[in-house]
């Protein structure tokens, strides 16, 4: 409801990576019914929350704070709270896509946490983790990487960990190999001239795009998120 429903990206996975084959096709209308969420198992609700948390990181500190303050109500499917975060997430996604439909630059920020997440999904053959669970680990990894890149302090890492734990999202990946993850990351669809463009956190609510992340920093993060 809050992510792929808006934006027009249509893609399929390949054995070499996630969403590597695709196109753009804008729908005429997107219908969202919060009542549908009542039909989902808890694991899927948790997975969807990962994408909402992402929007707080990349675009809206107030959304991030609201999620932290209302985690219990959201997990209990309080419709008033859900309506706020779902609508705000869609507004953010639409605003970004409106400015950069084909991902020439700005739209890449929507991939915050997804470089690592896609690698985890690929390494585990898309069977061990839901997309949202992998994104949860990826968000934590992206904030760690931002910290090691000296962009955010250790308190931001702590706040990130606490929020992800409130929504019962995993912070570490099982059945993954660091070297394999590093290889998959290098094939990321955002890579240009062999350099991966990382989405890094400048502060909660603001991110930057950088290809100046060192191999040592990446491997340090991967070692920290793999168990």
Stretches found by the model and what they are:
Residues 19, 26, 106-107, 196:
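A generic hydrophobic-helix recognition signal that picks specific residues
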Residues 65-66, 70-179:
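Active-site segments that bind and position negatively charged phosphate/pyrophosphate groups
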Residues 42, 46, 60-64, 79, ...:
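Alpha-helix initiation and N-capping motif
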Residues 1-70:
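A glycine/threonine-rich phosphate-anchoring loop and its flanking beta-alpha core
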Residues 3-4, 13, 18, 44, ...:
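Short glycine- and Lys/Arg-enriched binding-loop motifs that mark or flank ligand-binding interfaces
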Residues 50, 151-227:
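C-terminal charged capping/lid subdomain of soluble metabolic enzymes
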Residues 24-25, 31-32, 111, 199-202:
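Short beta-strand segments
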